A protein has these predicted regions:
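Non-catalytic cap/lid and distal C-terminal segments of serine-dependent acyl enzymes
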Residues: 1-248
């Protein structure tokens, strides 16, 4: 139990090579372990590799272990200058929007690797994708486009505005997975559009059929690692504890 590091890992066609950071909780089950995959792995655990402080996800998981089924946590480092391109589902500016291929690598290589080497579950309902900002929209898109792979998402302060907010039209064109756990949040001290769009997306997904939704409006939340670190326990409780259905 503890930390493991893979890499540098080569994600084909997605330079540069990167670290994959893994934490196995002390209370992890011997088999069928839930899995939480987080984008921007530099920010997931300690402060050292992060530009603005880490989430210390390992500490959050351990503190909640008596209340939730503790997941194995995987942080995938972003590609530096390629980050926007690999996390965007749609073209924007000079970025071609290559998230689909990155998600395919997660589905075809990363998850099977975790299942084989870390006793991670084969039940998609126990596999959650998460992130913040660009990682937030990537996590939401990943769940909606691959509901047979992921059973939940954590989308903190998702950048829904990118590509002229195209994700709204995209989400309205398809059914949302009814039983998937969808956590979305935003802070009142972020740019107003961030909060308004996050709230609006929560309602869109309900209209499209999602029923395990949790939207949290953080009255003091800013667009920062510190705010996401503070909100992470709430997201973990929703994803890996007993979820309550949305009421509208």
């Amino acid at each position: 139990m503890g930390f493991y590091f893979m890499g540098p890992v080569d994600v084909p066609d997605y330079p540069p090579q990167r670290l994959v950071r893994i934490y196995v909780p002390n209370r992890a089950h011997a088999s069928d372990r839930p899995l939480l995959i987080l984008f921007d792995g530099q920010n997931v655990f300690d402060d050292a590799p992060s530009f603005a402080g880490g989430w210390r996800a390992h500490e959050r998981v351990e503190k909640l272990a008596k209340k939730v089924s503790p997941p194995v946590v995987v942080g995938i480092d972003h590609g530096g200058g390629h980050r926007i391109e690999e996390l965007s589902p749609f073209p924007m500016g000079r970025s071609h929007g290559r998230l689909d291929g990155f998600l395919d690598w997660i589905k075809r290589w990363l998850i099977p690797h975790m299942q084989h080497h870390f006793a991670v579950t084969h039940d998609p309902r126990k596999i959650v994708l998460g992130g913040s900002s660009m990682g937030g929209i990537a996590a939401l898109y990943g769940l909606l486009s691959l509901p047979h792979v992921f059973g939940g998402c954590i989308a903190m302060s998702p950048s829904l505005w990118i590509a002229r907010a195209r994700i709204f039209q995209w989400a309205e064109s398809r059914p949302a997975p009814e039983h998937a756990r969808i956590y979305i949040d935003a802070g009142k001290r972020e740019p107003p559009t961030m909060h308004t769009q996050a709230d609006a997306m929560d309602k869109v997904l309900y209209r499209q059929g999602a029923r395990n939704l949790h939207f949290f409006s953080d009255p003091t939340g800013t667009h920062s690692e510190a705010a996401w670190r503070k909100r992470l326990p709430r997201a973990l409780r929703f994803q890996f504890g007993s979820a309550k259905k949305a009421a509208y």
